[in-house]
């Protein structure tokens, strides 16, 4: 009996907390609970991104076949990127630690830098200032001036690199997926162990990656101008 009381109290605390955060609502007349607006918003958010993955899937699979490297698709969520799709590369027995649903800061990832390069400079600076900037590895860019020189370089090249800035032993090349305004909320990347990802290999991957970003942008109704 004591166990049942404890369970009811725990459930009540959880429901109260969820009510305060808008995930559920309590009907004052019936005392019954139903889904709140926050939960509905989350459902819509998930469905929207499933749609993006569905539209991008064929291009991502083609990119994986062309390069035999690990392919990622991410979306921006405020100061972070969230991984929403991954295709493991067949070119290495080593598997990236990345996983669908993983969240990382914009500033220390190739995909994040690619996305920030499509933003107005004032917005990119606001993201930097709001981020808890620290060195994930010895290669993470933590100096503000150096970071914005890097963003300017990404704008000029049309792609971004992650030189072991987030994960030691892994190098990435990334490209943003711009919408019709030229702004990006999604990006793709190719990742491989640093030992195989020399500059020459980066240049080999650049063409397939940029073609894929253009094709996904077109599939999503965005820009195809790069």
Predicted regions and their residues:
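Extended hydrophobic
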Residues: 140-212
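Amphipathic alpha-helical effector-binding/dimerization core
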Residues: 29-130
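Short beta-strand "wing" residues that participate in macromolecule-binding interfaces
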Residues: 26
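Glycine-centered, phosphate/nucleic-acid-interacting loop/turn motifs that mediate DNA/RNA or nucleotide
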Residues: 22
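Short, small-residue-biased leader/transition segments that mark boundaries at the very start
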Residues: 1-6
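Basic amphipathic alpha-helical segments that dock to polyanions
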Residues: 17-18
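Key DNA-contact positions within bacterial/archaeal DNA-binding proteins
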Residues: 9
